[in-house]
Amino acid sequence: MKNDVISPEFDENGRPLRRIRSFVRRQGRLTKGQEHALENYWPVMGVEFSEAPVDFATLFGREAPVTLEIGFGMGASLVAMAKARPEQNFLGIEVHSPGVGACLASAHEEGVENLHVMCHDAVEVLHKMIPDNSLSMVQLFFPDPWHKARHNKRRIVQVPFAELVLSKLKLGGVFHMATDWEAYAEHMLEVMSSIDGYKNLSESNDYVPRPESRPVTKFEQRGHRLGHGVWDLMFERVK
């Protein structure tokens, strides 16, 4: 399993300036279970980065709607979603290998067979590997908010990224985001609302209630106990 996890930095007009990390590498130590999963399940479920577009029908061995999740953490909710929807295909991207190992272990334990994972920079994967008009859903749950003003430019949700996602979605496909940082939710709403081709699925033209399809994470449950809010945004590709 290879790692090269660099994301572009954007200027105030959304143009790439140089390549820096849009996240902090917190690899930590692998547990024995995670190491075992990477050694034994990665050859079956893992996808190495390639400069060539992936053929989803070949990868999954069938034609089915594809959901891409960016930054799946330890993979608990991703595995739960894949298990609950065996008729769909799921591809997860996470840059931290302990999370990838945990996800592989969980998927194996749950008998999930409609899930593949990658350990690489999602922006580069989108550019190089994901065919245009190929995804039914893109999920981005609780990305790093980079709450300090000087770090806001590191936020993954910027106009160029949202436009890139738009190009990978099928017509009618949905970009689903969630954050527990209100300022980031407002930023996401501003970015997404500025792009022609997206339609906000919120009846009030801002946020949507958490759909049942998105499991509540332990992180989110802890936030609820502390009185923290969570904002879900869902935008459909309409052109």
Swiss-Prot record:
Catalytic residues (UniProt): 144
GO cellular component: tRNA methyltransferase complex
Gene3D superfamilies: Vaccinia Virus protein VP39
UniProt entry tagged with the keyword Transit peptide: no
InterPro entries on file: SAM-dependent_MTases_sf, tRNA_(Gua-N-7)_MeTrfase_Trmb, tRNA_methyltr_TrmB_bact
tRNA processing found in the keyword field: yes
Biological or metabolic pathway of the protein: tRNA modification; N(7)-methylguanine-tRNA biosynthesis
GO MF, one annotated term: tRNA (guanine(46)-N7)-methyltransferase activity
EC code(s) of this entry: 2.1.1.33
Keyword terms: Methyltransferase, S-adenosyl-L-methionine, Transferase, tRNA processing
Group of enzyme by EC: transferase
Reactions that this protein is recorded to catalyse: guanosine(46) in tRNA + S-adenosyl-L-methionine = N(7)-methylguanosine(46) in tRNA + S-adenosyl-L-homocysteine
Residues engaged in binding substrate: 148, 180, 217-220
Family that this chain belongs to: Belongs to the class I-like SAM-binding methyltransferase superfamily. TrmB family.
NCBIfam families: tRNA (guanosine(46)-N7)-methyltransferase TrmB
Alphabetical list of HAMAP family matching this protein: tRNA_methyltr_TrmB (MF_01057)
Known function: Catalyzes the formation of N(7)-methylguanine at position 46 (m7G46) in tRNA.
Name assigned to this protein: tRNA (guanine-N(7)-)-methyltransferase
Lineage: Bacteria, Pseudomonadati, Pseudomonadota, Gammaproteobacteria, Enterobacterales
